[in-house]
Amino acid sequence: MSISTMTSMTDGGCDQSIKILKTGINVKKVVEQLKKYPQDWDHQKTLEGSQSLVDRGFDDLPVSALQLIIGGVKHKEDFVGDSEINIKTPAYAHHSEIRKIIRKQFKNADIHRCGFLSLPVDEIVGAHIDEGTYYLSRNRYHLSILGRYQYFCGKETVIVEPGTLLWFNNKLPHGTVNIGDETRITFVFDIPHGQS
């Protein structure tokens, strides 16, 4: 794997699988809101009608999630990865600072499914591909909030510091390792093609 520090991005029309779009973004106010609302972590598990992908046979991951916009389905047997339904969670209103940063970077783009993911020290999220038709028309991004981590996608790998905004090709195998000395928190979000 090669270490990359790439810039600029279009709607996936290139050979790179990871692109660093910006570094040094001030995420202090985001961290303050996360500390103010600790009860928001994993709150989506208690929402009426909510079902985990683990319940549907997908591998469990060593992460906690604080989802602001989740995918929805019309029928219980439908696969959320093939659904275009996006639903704001109750925690959405608590986390305005992250949305301000995204709006500053992407102007009038629609933010679709999004949330914070935490990963304990030395833990790994193994290689996986985000499955379903939903992902075919969207770009996926990370904005690193806390901790230092190694991120890999395809044959590329980068070391990510807090305040780093990156795009990656989630149609390729990708994953991460927390190489820092604190829990890694990143904000993962989707923007439709043509808006990023």
Question: Model segments located where?
Answer:
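Conserved metal-binding segment of the jelly-roll/cupin
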Residues: 159-173
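Conserved short histidine dyad/triad with adjacent acidic residue
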Residues: 116-134
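Non-heme Fe(II)/2-oxoglutarate
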Residues: 1-106
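Asparagine-centered strand-capping/turn motif at beta-strand->loop junctions
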Residues: 176-180
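Short, surface-exposed beta-strand-loop junctions and turns on beta-sheet-rich folds
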Residues: 133, 157-159, 183
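Short connector loops at helix/strand junctions that flank enzyme active sites
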Residues: 109-111, 120-122, 136-140, 146-148
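A short beta-strand-loop-beta hairpin characteristic of the jelly-roll/cupin
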Residues: 126, 142-161
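A short hydrophobic beta-strand segment most commonly corresponding to one strand
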Residues: 139-144, 165-167, 181-196
